[in-house]
Regions:
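Bacterial N-terminal signal peptides that target proteins for export
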Residues: 1-8
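N-terminal signal peptide c-region/cleavage motif recognized by signal peptidases
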Residues: 16-18
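Short N-terminal segments immediately surrounding and downstream of signal-peptide cleavage
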Residues: 22-41
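Terminal connector regions
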Residues: 25, 94-136
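Asparagine-centered strand-capping/turn motif at beta-strand->loop junctions
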Residues: 44-51
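Short acidic/proline- and small/hydrophobic-mixed sequence motifs that coincide with surface turns
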Residues: 52-56
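Intrinsically disordered, low-complexity Pro/Gly/Ser/Thr-rich segments with frequent PxxP/GP/PP motifs
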Residues: 64-102, 106, 111
Length: 136
């Protein structure tokens, strides 16, 4: 059984990420893509608008083809992300960029020091690319 102080401490860590869609504290933007050698580099911009630093933020991403079929699954480490900081992360997918129609954030598998579920709930997503949707 958790004591009251421990519960309060856990809530203090998780609260910044338990936000409504209008007030998300953790934003992930698919900013651009670059093709090279049958691979597609996905460039993400991560905005941590909270006052909590993340040691780790692992996303389970699924790339779907333009026909809706699953192309690839990619486990990514987006962290560490300091509090009130914006960073860029790049990941390569073994597929041509023109084959990718959308990217699903299937799950958040790690979100230290918080809980993955709280990070997923408070995660805001966007894409600068009209032809490539990022969603959860």
């Amino acid at each position: 059984m958790l004591g009251p102080l421990r519960v309060l401490a856990m809530l203090a860590v998780l609260m910044p990420f338990c936000a409504s869609a209008a007030n998300e504290k953790l934003l992930v933007e698919l900013n651009s893509i670059e093709g090279a050698d049958n691979r597609c580099r996905l460039n993400f911009v991560i905005h941590n608008k909270s006052d909590v630093s993340l040691e780790s933020m692992k996303l389970d991403l699924v790339a779907f083809g333009t026909d809706g079929s699953i192309l690839r699954r990619l486990l990514t480490e987006m962290g560490p992300v300091r509090a009130a900081k914006t960073i860029v992360r790049t990941f390569a997918v073994e597929a041509e960029c023109r084959q990718i129609g959308s990217i699903l954030v299937n799950d958040v598998t790690a979100c230290a020091p918080g809980e993955p579920g709280a990070c997923l709930d408070g995660l805001g997503l966007s894409s600068r690319l009209q032809a490539l949707r990022l969603y959860k």
